[in-house]
């Protein structure tokens, strides 16, 4: 079976943007991912797109977003106009989740059986604040709280920190909680909450600036969606949310023809990451580990025994998210283990 080769051409990102996709009532889906919708944008492999995305915070209550954010001291002129428009004009289908997704982007030549690489070239903040929202029934400890607990957190862009409190400042690590291709047609419309082989709500903090996300393609054009911006999040997203925020990512889309993967994969300047997805955390762990061993055998030429041993000695398993019905476990393989690695498009230790 063919696979994603680590010996691939290095395509350097340029400052040129080939397309822009705004978040408007006509270019977003609310709470679901669907297949074969009309394209919001069509591009070629290798092209770069700047996207606007919207956080769902402030849009899922019965009051409008201006009133929601006014309660936290945010003036009307700091509430995004496209968020107000989506709240007023877009209706969530029955049974849909909360996330607002921009797309779909069709990539020419992407066909079922290919792999779509999504390079995260840049992420900008659209607003200087985000929200962490939890409460009864949410997160890993659903019985911990007896009342809803929404916390607005200011973002200091100059210092690149989130001002959790006077004493606690959290370094920013922005990433898109949801990046997805359209799922197999047999699934029909799927909720945006549980992730799957198509990506989706993987909430994996390693998919920030300078990362590549690899997704299997199930439908012609790939049909890419993104949303659920996070300013920062810990492994697990344990209370059910990150600092949820509206972001503007710049992404490059590269189709790898004739390649095959079963689960989403990630590559950074320092690590290879495989993933396992399951409603059962133990099964997700087994899948992530098996994916890592398969990677080491195919990409690094190792025997199964050596790959298993190396995984026990130097590969870290972690819980990417534990709150979205389907759990995600990752296996992180440090590149420093290998004397030589193919050149990566994003240099290490880049500021």
Where are each of the predicted segments found?
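Conserved mixed alpha/beta catalytic, RNA-binding, or beta-rich assembly cores of soluble enzyme
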Residues: 172-282, 293
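A generic structural signal for residues embedded in beta-strands
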Residues: 51, 115-118, 215
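Short, Lys/Arg- and Gly-enriched loop/turn segments at beta-strand edges
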Residues: 56-68, 123-133, 221-231, 320-323
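C-terminal alpha-helical interaction appendages
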Residues: 276-351
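Short, well-ordered loop/turn sites that connect or cap secondary structure elements
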Residues: 43, 107-110, 207
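Intrinsically disordered, low-complexity linker/loop segments enriched in Gly/Pro
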Residues: 78-79, 86-89, 94-106, 115-205
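N-terminal, Lys/Arg-enriched amphipathic/low-complexity engagement segments
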Residues: 11-12, 18-94
């Amino acid at each position: 079976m063919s696979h994603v080769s680590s010996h691939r051409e290095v395509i350097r990102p340029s400052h040129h943007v080939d397309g822009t996709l705004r978040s408007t009532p006509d270019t977003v889906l609310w709470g679901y991912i669907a297949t074969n919708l009309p394209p919001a944008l069509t591009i070629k492999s290798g092209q770069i797109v700047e996207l606007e995305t919207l956080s769902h915070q402030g849009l899922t209550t019965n009051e409008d977003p201006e009133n929601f954010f006014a309660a936290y001291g945010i003036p009307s002129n700091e509430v995004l106009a496209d968020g107000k428009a989506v709240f007023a004009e877009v209706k969530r289908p029955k049974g849909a989740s909360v996330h607002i997704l921009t797309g779909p982007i069709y990539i020419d030549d992407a066909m079922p059986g290919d792999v779509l690489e999504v390079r995260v070239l840049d992420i900008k903040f659209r607003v200087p604040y985000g929200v962490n929202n939890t409460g009864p029934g949410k997160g890993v400890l659903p019985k911990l709280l007896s009342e809803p607990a929404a916390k607005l957190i200011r973002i200091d862009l100059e210092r690149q920190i989130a001002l959790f409190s006077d004493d606690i400042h959290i370094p920013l690590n922005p990433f898109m909680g949801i990046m997805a291709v359209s799922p197999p047609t047999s699934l029909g419309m799927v909720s945006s909450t549980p992730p799957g082989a198509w990506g989706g709500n993987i909430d994996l903090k390693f998919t920030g600036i300078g990362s590549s996300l690899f997704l299997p393609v199930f439908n012609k054009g790939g049909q890419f969606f993104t949303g659920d911006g996070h300013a920062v999040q810990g492994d697990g997203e344990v209370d059910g949310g990150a600092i949820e925020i509206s972001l503007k990512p710049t992404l490059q889309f590269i189709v790898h023809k004739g390649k095959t993967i079963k689960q989403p994969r990630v590559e950074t300047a320092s690590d290879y990451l495989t993933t396992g997805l399951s409603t059962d955390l133990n099964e997700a762990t087994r899948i992530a580990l098996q994916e890592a061993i398969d990677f080491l055998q195919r990409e690094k030429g190792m025997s199964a025994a050596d790959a298993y041993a190396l995984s026990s000695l130097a590969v870290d398993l972690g819980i990417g998210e534990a709150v979205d019905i389907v759990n995600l476990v990752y296996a992180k393989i440090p590149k420093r283990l290998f004397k030589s690695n193919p050149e990566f498009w994003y240099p290490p230790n880049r500021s």
